[in-house]
């Protein structure tokens, strides 16, 4: 069995780790960074960029640069939270045929699972380069408060990337694993996880290698991106007041504002004031306009205060569900880049009445936890038992549109639970089972996960037939539902797939696209490498010709010039094989030039030595070159 890797698929950044013996290790990417921006971009010529290269060109290519796609994963296009994002991102969010929110680039649509798969592929390649072996299995993390559709979409992303997802693990639980693995400590901890796009809080009990989640709560649309957007709105408003120009209508300016906002936010965690300076942000009839503004930490905190306060209620609910008070929490572990913000740390301290634990790297701890879980599944990590919970209640719609819970939130998973229902009308021969997830009393106010029909119920007065509905949640938090007529034994079951979501055919197509793209990317990379090598050879050959061309025969010089000309012509195209062939031809032709250069150098060195040694006589033997050649 090959290595199983742990991946933190984040909204803003992603990270990959692996067990190195008994120690989890974060793997650096090709750029030498321990985290990779979760950004995918498409260039003019169709080249796909992932991570840092995609982030670098975002300002000049805003409409083709997709960031924070995790906020769309498993969501419907008409979701109010998606509606909000549509006006804040420079790329296009489109409605898919199944009603899901997808993204559109140059007329081509991509599902959020597909875009996430490109990031996962990058993490897979990073691990393979480090391990020197193929990797095809992973543990991937998701926010604890992700619903079934979002978990399924994340699993689909893994499949598209060529990974078998052995386990979907909740981010706070992964962080707790990383925090508690080497500690003899026992007790109750709270994990406060404020990342790039989501907020989670989990209460866990740790002892003797058992990590038991007591409760979890959160908000899957609250994170660093919202803090950035709040600052972007403020900057745009201030600029409009001063200059009368709305920067929100300019996608290039909007992207520059976003980068500046993110940078300012990070700086204000360690300094009390920063300056935002964006020259030539836009122009009007009077000429170019510049944006220059000083921003204090106090002003930024005032702008985002309500966002920080929004994390308090989920913490209180999690404590209540766990049956604990804040004073009974032994330690609060901070996870996610946003927890570096002093205001966030202050709110956590006030809420739990103690200084939060800062001994873990908030950007890496989740990936480390995922790697530990991978080690558990592989058998490399012993004596660790993880007991997680389902974050939201599950149930079905019953008479009058009521939501009837079958599995309550914070139930330990995997779990299985059944309940018997009956018909609402006389002689009813079929029932439609509509499955929902959420905490509201009316089914319509919760998230519908899917529906199916149980047919062929024998005619009987209403209330007589007995229909047993069974919910089965696996260790990934993914739901299976079955309905059985107890009289006939007829059964119907589905693995929940939202009315949206990707079908198997969709996933297979995307897997094939990803494989085809991988081949295309390899070809493109080979072409770039070949071009770079060829360019370098042309440059060095032309330089050498200019300096030493007179030392070779005219025919040899002409042959080199022709080879240079042919290679330059080949460089106008993208045929890697043709470029390689012409490069080899030039390399062969220019060998005579190289010989002439070395001969001249040897003569110069000999003259230098002779000048140095004119006091001392030296004996030397002349070698007959022709004799040597014959005997060789």
UniProtKB/Swiss-Prot annotation:
The modification Phosphothreonine is found at residue 198. The keyword Nucleotide-binding applies. Residues 524-557 are annotated as: Disordered. PROSITE patterns: HSP70_1, HSP70_2, HSP70_3. Coiled coil: none annotated. Induction: By stress conditions e.g. heat shock. InterPro entries: ATPase_NBD (IPR043129), Chaperone_DnaK (IPR012725), Heat_shock_70_CS (IPR018181), HSP70_C_sf (IPR029048), HSP70_peptide-bd_sf (IPR029047), Hsp_70_fam (IPR013126). One of its GO terms (molecular function) is ATP-dependent protein folding chaperone. Signal peptide: none annotated. Keywords: ATP-binding, Chaperone, Nucleotide-binding, Phosphoprotein, Stress response. Belongs to the heat shock protein 70 family. Acts as a chaperone. NCBIfam families: PRK00290.1 (NF001413), PRK05183.1 (NF003520), prok_dnaK (TIGR02350). This is Chaperone protein DnaK.
């Amino acid at each position: 069995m090959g290595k199983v890797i742990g991946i933190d698929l984040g909204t803003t950044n992603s990270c990959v780790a692996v067990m190195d013996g008994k120690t989890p290790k974060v793997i650096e990417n090709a750029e030498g960074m321990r985290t990779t921006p979760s950004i995918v971009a498409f260039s003019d010529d169709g080249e796909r960029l992932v991570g840092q290269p995609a982030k670098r060109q975002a300002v000049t290519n805003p409409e083709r640069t997709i960031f924070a796609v995790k906020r769309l994963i498993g969501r419907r296009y008409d979701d109010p939270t998606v509606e909000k994002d549509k006006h804040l991102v420079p790329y296009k969010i489109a409605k898919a045929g199944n009603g899901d929110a997808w993204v559109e680039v140059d007329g081509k649509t991509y599902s959020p699972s597909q875009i996430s798969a490109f990031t996962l592929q990058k993490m897979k390649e990073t691990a393979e380069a480090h391990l020197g072996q193929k990797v095809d299995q992973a543990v991937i993390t998701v926010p604890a408060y992700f619903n079934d559709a979002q978990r399924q979409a994340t699993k689909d992303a893994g499949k598209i990337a060529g990974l078998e997802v052995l386990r979907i693990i909740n981010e706070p639980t992964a962080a707790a694993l990383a925090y508690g693995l080497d500690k003899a400590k026992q007790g109750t901890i709270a994990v406060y996880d404020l990342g790039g796009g989501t907020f989670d809080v989990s209460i866990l009990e740790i002892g003797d290698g058992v990590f038991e989640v007591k409760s979890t709560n959160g908000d899957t649309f609250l994170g660093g991106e919202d803090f950035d957007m709040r600052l972007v709105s403020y900057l745009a408003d201030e600029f409009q007041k001063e200059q009368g120009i709305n920067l929100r209508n300019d996608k290039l300016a909007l992207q520059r504002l976003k980068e500046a906002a993110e940078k300012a936010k990070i700086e204000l965690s360690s300094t009390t004031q920063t300056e935002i300076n964006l020259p030539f942000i836009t122009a009007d009839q009077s000429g170019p306009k510049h944006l220059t503004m000083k921003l204090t930490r106090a002003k930024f905190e005032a702008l985002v205060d309500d966002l920080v306060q929004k994390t308090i209620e989920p913490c209180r609910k999690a404590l209540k569900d766990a049956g604990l008070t804040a004073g009974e929490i032994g330690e609060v572990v901070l996870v996610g880049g946003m927890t570096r913000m002093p205001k966030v740390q202050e709110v956590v301290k006030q809420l739990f009445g103690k200084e939060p634990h800062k001994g873990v790297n908030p950007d890496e701890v989740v990936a480390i936890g995922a790697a530990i879980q991978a080690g558990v599944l592989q058998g490399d990590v012993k004596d660790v038992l993880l007991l997680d919970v389902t974050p939201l209640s599950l149930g079905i719609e019953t008479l009058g549109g009521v939501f009837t819970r079958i599995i309550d939130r914070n139930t330990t998973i995997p779990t299985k639970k059944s309940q018997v229902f009956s018909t609402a009308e006389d002689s009813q021969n079929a029932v439609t089972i509509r499955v929902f997830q959420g905490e509201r009393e009316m089914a319509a106010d919760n998230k519908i996960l899917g529906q199916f029909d149980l047919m062929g119920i024998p005619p009987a007065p209403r209330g007589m037939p007995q229909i047993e509905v069974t919910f089965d949640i696996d260790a990934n938090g993914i739901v299976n539902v079955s309905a059985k007529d107890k009289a006939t034994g007829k059964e119907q079951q589905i693995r929940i797939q939202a009315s949206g979501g990707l079908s198997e055919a969709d996933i297979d197509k995307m897997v094939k696209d990803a494989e085809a793209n991988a081949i295309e990317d390899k070809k493109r990379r080979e072409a770039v490498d070949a071009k770079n090598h060829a360019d370098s050879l042309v440059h060095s050959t032309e330089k050498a010709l200019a300096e030493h061309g007179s030392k070779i025969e005219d025919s040899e010089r002409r042959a080199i010039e022709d080879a240079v000309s042919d290679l330059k012509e080949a460089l106008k195209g993208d045929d890697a094989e043709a470029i390689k062939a012409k490069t080899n031809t030039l390399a062969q032709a220019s060998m005579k030039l190289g010989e002439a250069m070395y001969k001249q150098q040897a003569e110069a060195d000999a003259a230098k030595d002779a000048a140095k040694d004119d006091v001392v006589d030296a004996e030397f033997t002349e070698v007959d070159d022709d004799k040597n050649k014959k005997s060789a």
